Amino acid sequence: MDRKTFLRTTVAGAAALVAAPGALVSCASPKEKKQPSVPLRLSFQEGVTPGETLAEKLDFMEKLGIVGFEPGGKGLAGRVQEIREALQGRDIQVSAICAGFDGFILAEDPAVKAQFDTSMREIVRAAGELGSTGVIMVPVFNWQNPALPHTLETRDYLCQQMHDLGEFALSCGTTVILEPLNRKEAFYLRLVGDAAAICRDAGSAGVKCMGDFWHMQEETSDYAAFMAAGPYLQHVHIASRGNRVMPGEDGDKDCYTDGFRALKELGYPNYVSFECGCRSDDRAATLTAAVDLLRKQWDEA
């Protein structure tokens, strides 16, 4: 293997080559690039928000100044009109779409892969109709078998598949967003920098990646993860650091300023979306406190 190929396919090479020049400077002197004017755009997944109906959920979000709504992808094509009408006249937009497809992209079984191709494209079309920033996808979970082996050939295959999917997403006015997971959930894609390298090598502006504060804490620092993503960063998930509940419910563990500082330095334009449970019986009060905590830490970052 020559040096160029080695750098292209290693974690170190991915992190080094993905970062834009400005990002590399920021990593060397992280306090010099603060951009406090960058707004914190918070989003809630549909299941996070209290309320019996979609209208009630959105009413609650509006009261807190939440500007993003992240629905699931399952059945999304049949909900486009419902969601459009519910958002009409509100200062809330659809952020990302949380998966919801059948099958998986790295399936060995052609029938399972075909399920992914069909269902994912249906969700991507609906995402485009809703003006979503993209559809989140994981290449393969630990429990999904049989899957293609973790080899250079599989990586090349994934890059080609992502290119095709990214181009389709662009034609629909949206993107596809690779999500790295922690090692307990995924063997294949675990670092934000690795996901960004695949975005780069896929060669399509429709292929992006995301970072999740819950998953990132096991793999690298929040700051380094986001800076490695650079211009490919399209979405962010957030939860408490100990038990994946609401930010603040795990006390002093729930510090996000390191990651927020990176998002500011990057001029990150998209959403930080709640993907978490709730320990408290009073979900509304806990969400309100969580939003206050994140806004405070954003100002401090």
Regions found by a protein language model. Give the residues of each.
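Histidine-acidic metal/acid-base catalytic patches
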Residues: 2-22, 27-43, 53-65, 131-133, ...
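Active-site acidic/histidine proton-transfer and metal-coordination neighborhood
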Residues: 10-21, 31-36, 106-208, 284
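A cross-domain feature marking catalytic cores of carbohydrate-active enzymes
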Residues: 42-48, 71-75, 96-101, 137-139, ...
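Generic anion/oxyanion-binding catalytic loop in active/binding sites
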Residues: 46, 50, 58, 105, ...
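Residues that cap or flank secondary-structure elements
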Residues: 48-50, 74-75, 115, 157, ...
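Surface-exposed charge patches
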Residues: 59, 84-85, 125, 167, ...
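Anion (oxyanion) recognition and catalysis
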Residues: 62, 88, 128, 170, ...
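Structural motif corresponding to the early beta-alpha repeats
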Residues: 67, 71-166, 244-246, 256, ...
